C-alpha cells in the first residue's frame, strides 16, 4: 500500500522538491540566506498547489503543469535578480502592467547572461529528474476510479486540510503580532505580510510563494467601515501647514510655477570633467543656462560685486533611489501607490467626479485658477500618462506625439516617436513652447510640469539621438576646432579631414580621458554622449527662460529643476562616483541635482547669507522629490494638510535631529519604491538591519531614525488607503 501511494505521489514530490531547490537558489542569489523565516507559511502554499494539481488523473498532465509552474519560478528568480542588480528592487504586481515600458527601456546591459545560463541548467536538471520520475509513474496507468478511490480522496483532503489549516494558522499568528492601529504595527511582521512597503524584508520572511500570495491578497483594497473611519480621522487630525509669520511663506504668492524633471541628471553634468569635485566645480561653458539659474546673471557679468543676491536655492543633499514614474508622482501627487501603479488608482476605471486627487499639485493649483499642463518630450502613452494625468488634475496633457505646428499638423510622426529617437531637447522646447508656457499667461497664472528625455540612457553612440549628433564634436574639441552648421543643426569639425592628433581636446574631454581612460575606456565615450544630452536639456531650459523674459513674466515665475534618479544605465554614475554595481545603500550615489529659482528668494537670500561667501541659498537638509509640493506651496503661501504629503517644506523645522561629525542635521526619512528606507546617514530594508554611511553606528541615531520612519510608514499606509478607496472627498481638513 505504502509503495503504491508513494508511486502515485512521485509527481507531487517532483514539484515540491523542485520548488524548494529553486527557493534555495532564490535566497542564495539575493543574499537572504537559505530559506524564509516563516518556512512553514511558504511550504503550506507549495503543498496546497502540489495537491491541487495532483487531483488531475493523468501523470503527464501533472508533470506538464508542475514543470510550467517551476518555469515561472525560474523566471521570477531572474526577474528579481535583475531588478535587484539594477535598482535594489524586487518584483511587485504593478510591474506586469509596465512590461511594454520595461521592454522599450531594456538594453543588453540589463541582461545577465551568466545567471540565465546557470538558472537554465538548474531548471533542465530538475525537469530531467522529473521526467525520469514520470516514466516510473507511467508504468502504472492511472484508472480514474482508482485515482478517486476513497483512500486517495481522504489523502488529498487530509493534505489539503493540513496545508490550509497551517497557512491560516500562520496568518492568524502573524496578524496577532500587532494591531493595525498600534504603535508597533509598522515595525512588525504583520505589516510586512499585509503590505509590500518593504519588499526585501517581506520576501526574506515569507519566501517566493508566500510573498506572491501576500501581494495577491493585498490587491483586495476594500476596507471595512472601521478602517475607513480611522483613515478619514487620520487626515482630519492632520496639522495644517500655515506658517504665515515665516520669512518664506507666501513670498511667491500668485506666481507661475514650472517644474522640470531632468531625466537621469547628475551634478557632474555641469562640471569640467573633474567629477570627484562634484557640485563645487560647475562649468559655465557646457551648461550656461543652469549655471545662470544657480549663480544669477549679475554674477556672470560682475562676480566680484559684494551686493549680489541671487534668487536660487541649491539642494546639495537631494536624494532619489527611484525610477522616473515614481519621482514624477512624488512631485505631482506627493506619493506613489505601493505595489500598484498609477493606472490602478487613476486609470481608465477611475471616476473623475470623485475628485479623489484634488490634493495633488495640479489639483490644488487648478482650484486656485491656475492653468495646469503636463508636457513630456516622449510619447504621452508611455506609463499610460494619457490615461492617468488628467485624473491627477492636469487640464492639458501633451506628449511629443501631441505637439502641433501653427497649421495644426503634428510636428513629430513615424520614427520620430520611437524609443531612443530623441529630438534635440532644445528644439522640442521651441516646438512645444506654447504648451509649456500657455498663450493665455497674461490672463491667469499657470503651472507646468515638464519631463525631459534627452539624457536618458543608454549612453552608447546613437545616431537617432539628436543632441548626441548636435554636440558630440563640441564636447570633444570645442569652438577652436568646430563650427556650428545652421543647416544640419550640429557642431562639425572645421577641418573635416583632420586627424585626432591635429585636434585639441577641450578641458572637459581632456579631464575625462585623464580620469577614466585607463580604468574604463568605454566610459569616456559614454560620458560624451551623456554630456550631449545634458547640454540639450540646458538648451531647453534656456528656451523657456528666454520666452519668460520675452513675455516679461520671468520675475513672476517660480522654477523648480530636479533629477529623477542617478544615471544607472551602463552603470555610468557608479563608475564616475566610484561605487560598486551592487551598492544600493549608498547615500552619495543617489544624491542628484535639485534647484529652485524663485523671485521671492532673492529678498530672503539677502537676509540669510553673506554675499561674499555664497550667492545662492545652500540647503543641506536631506531631501527628495517628496518635498517639492510642500516647498512650492510654502513659497506660494498655500496652506495644506501635512498628513496628505510624505514630504516637508525645505523651510520647515523638523522634530528630530542628530549629530553628523559634529554638525547637527535634521532627521528626514525617505521611502524608496525601489526598496529600502533612508535618512542622511542610515539605510535599512527591514527595520532590523542598518547600514551606516558617513558616521559611526549610533543607537541614538537608530532610535530617532526608527521613530521618524514609523511616522512615515503610518502616513504611507493611510495615504494608500485614501488613494485605493478614493476617500479624499470625505476629508474635511483640506
Question: PLM features: residue spans?
Answer:
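Transmembrane and membrane-interface helices of multi-pass
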Residues: 2-211, 715, 725, 734
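Short, charge-rich amphipathic segments
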Residues: 4-19, 26, 211-225, 282, ...
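Alpha-helical protein-protein interaction elements
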Residues: 22, 159, 192-195, 201, ...
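A broad, low-specificity signal for short, low-complexity segments enriched in glycine/proline
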Residues: 64, 83, 213-221, 407-410, ...
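Short, intrinsically disordered/low-complexity patches at protein termini
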Residues: 201, 209-224, 397, 471-473, ...
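Short coil-to-helix leader/linker segments, especially the first N-terminal amphipathic alpha-helix
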Residues: 215-246
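Solvent-exposed soluble domains appended to multi-pass membrane proteins
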Residues: 236-734
Amino acid at each position: 500500500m505504502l509503495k503504491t501511494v508513494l508511486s502515485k505521489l512521485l509527481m507531487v514530490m517532483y514539484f515540491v522538491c523542485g520548488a524548494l531547490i529553486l527557493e534555495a537558489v532564490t535566497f542564495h542569489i539575493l543574499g537572504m540566506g537559505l530559506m524564509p523565516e516563516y518556512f512553514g507559511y511558504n511550504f503550506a502554499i507549495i503543498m496546497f498547489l502540489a495537491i491541487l494539481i495532483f487531483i488531475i488523473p493523468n501523470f503527464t498532465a501533472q508533470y506538464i503543469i508542475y514543470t510550467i509552474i517551476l518555469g515561472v519560478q525560474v523566471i521570477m528568480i531572474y526577474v528579481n535578480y535583475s531588478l535587484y542588480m539594477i535598482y535594489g528592487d524586487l518584483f511587485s504586481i504593478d510591474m506586469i502592467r509596465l512590461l511594454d515600458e520595461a521592454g522599450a527601456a531594456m538594453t543588453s546591459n540589463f541582461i545577465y547572461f551568466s545567471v540565465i545560463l546557470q538558472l537554465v541548467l538548474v531548471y533542465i536538471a530538475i525537469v530531467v529528474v522529473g521526467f525520469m520520475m514520470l516514466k516510473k509513474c507511467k508504468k502504472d496507468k492511472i484508472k480514474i476510479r482508482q485515482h478517486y478511490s476513497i483512500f486517495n480522496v481522504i489523502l488529498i483532503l487530509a493534505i489539503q486540510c493540513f496545508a490550509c489549516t497551517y497557512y491560516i494558522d500562520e496568518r492568524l499568528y502573524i496578524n496577532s503580532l500587532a494591531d493595525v492601529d498600534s504603535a508597533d504595527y509598522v515595525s512588525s511582521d504583520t505589516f510586512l505580510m499585509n503590505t509590500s512597503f518593504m519588499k526585501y524584508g517581506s520576501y526574506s520572511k515569507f519566501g517566493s510563494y508566500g510573498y506572491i500570495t501576500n501581494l495577491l491578497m493585498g490587491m483586495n483594497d476594500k476596507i471595512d467601515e472601521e478602517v475607513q473611519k480611522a483613515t478619514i480621522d487620520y487626515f482630519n487630525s492632520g496639522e495644517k501647514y500655515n506658517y504665515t509669520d515665516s520669512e518664506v511663506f507666501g513670498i511667491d504668492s500668485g506666481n507661475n510655477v514650472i517644474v522640470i524633471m531632468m531625466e537621469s541628471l547628475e551634478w557632474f553634468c555641469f562640471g569640467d570633467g573633474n567629477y570627484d569635485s562634484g557640485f563645487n566645480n560647475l562649468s559655465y561653458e557646457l551648461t550656461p543656462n543652469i549655471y545662470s539659474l544657480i549663480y544669477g546673471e549679475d554674477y556672470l557679468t560682475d562676480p566680484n560685486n559684494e551686493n549680489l543676491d541671487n534668487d536660487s536655492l541649491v539642494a546639495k543633499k537631494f536624494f532619489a533611489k527611484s525610477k522616473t514614474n515614481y519621482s514624477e508622482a512624488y512631485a505631482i501627487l506627493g506619493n506613489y501607490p505601493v505595489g500598484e501603479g498609477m493606472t490602478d488608482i487613476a486609470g481608465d476605471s477611475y471616476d473623475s467626479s470623485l475628485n479623489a486627487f484634488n490634493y495633488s499639485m495640479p489639483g490644488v493649483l487648478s482650484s486656485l485658477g491656475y492653468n495646469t499642463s503636463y508636457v513630456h518630450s516622449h510619447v504621452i502613452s508611455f506609463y499610460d500618462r494619457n490615461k492617468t494625468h488628467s485624473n491627477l488634475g492636469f487640464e492639458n496633457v501633451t506628449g511629443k506625439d501631441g505637439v502641433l505646428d501653427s497649421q495644426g499638423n503634428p510636428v513629430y510622426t513615424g520614427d520620430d516617436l520611437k524609443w531612443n529617437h530623441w529630438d534635440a531637447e532644445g528644439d522640442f522646447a521651441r516646438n512645444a513652447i506654447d504648451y509649456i508656457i500657455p498663450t493665455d499667461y497674461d490672463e491667469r497664472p499657470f503651472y507646468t510640469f515638464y519631463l525631459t528625455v534627452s539624457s536618458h540612457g543608454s549612453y552608447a553612440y546613437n545616431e537617432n539621438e539628436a543632441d548626441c549628433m548636435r554636440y558630440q564634436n563640441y564636447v570633444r574639441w570645442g569652438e577652436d576646432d568646430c563650427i556650428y552648421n545652421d543647416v544640419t543643426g550640429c557642431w562639425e569639425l572645421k577641418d573635416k579631414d583632420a586627424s585626432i592628433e591635429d585636434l585639441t581636446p577641450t578641458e572637459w574631454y581632456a579631464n575625462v580621458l585623464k580620469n577614466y581612460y585607463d580604468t574604463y575606456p568605454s566610459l569616456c565615450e559614454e560620458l560624451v554622449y551623456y554630456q550631449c544630452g545634458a547640454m540639450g536639456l540646458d538648451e531647453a531650459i534656456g528656451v523657456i527662460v528666454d520666452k519668460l523674459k520675452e513675455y516679461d513674466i520671468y520675475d513672476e515665475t517660480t522654477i523648480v529643476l530636479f533629477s529623477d534618479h542617478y544615471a544607472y544605465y551602463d552603470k555610468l554614475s557608479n563608475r564616475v562616483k566610484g561605487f560598486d554595481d551592487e551598492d544600493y545603500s549608498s547615500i552619495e550615489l543617489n544624491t542628484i541635482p535639485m534647484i529652485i529659482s524663485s523671485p521671492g528668494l532673492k529678498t530672503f537670500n539677502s537676509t540669510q547669507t553673506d554675499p561674499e561667501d555664497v550667492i545662492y541659498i545652500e540647503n543641506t537638509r536631506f531631501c527628495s522629490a517628496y518635498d517639492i509640493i510642500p516647498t512650492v506651496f510654502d513659497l506660494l503661501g498655500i496652506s495644506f494638510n501635512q498628513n496628505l504629503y510624505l514630504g516637508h517644506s525645505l523651510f520647515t523645522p523638523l522634530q528630530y535631529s542628530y549629530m553628523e561629525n559634529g554638525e547637527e542635521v535634521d532627521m528626514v526619512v525617505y521611502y524608496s519604491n525601489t526598496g529600502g528606507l533612508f535618512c542622511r546617514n542610515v539605510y535599512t530594508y527591514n527595520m532590523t538591519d542598518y547600514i551606516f554611511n558617513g558616521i559611526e553606528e549610533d543607537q541614538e541615531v537608530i532610535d530617532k531614525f526608527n521613530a521618524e520612519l514609523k511616522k512615515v510608514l503610518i502616513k504611507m499606509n493611510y495615504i494608500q488607503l485614501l488613494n485605493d478607496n478614493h476617500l479624499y472627498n470625505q476629508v474635511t481638513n483640506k
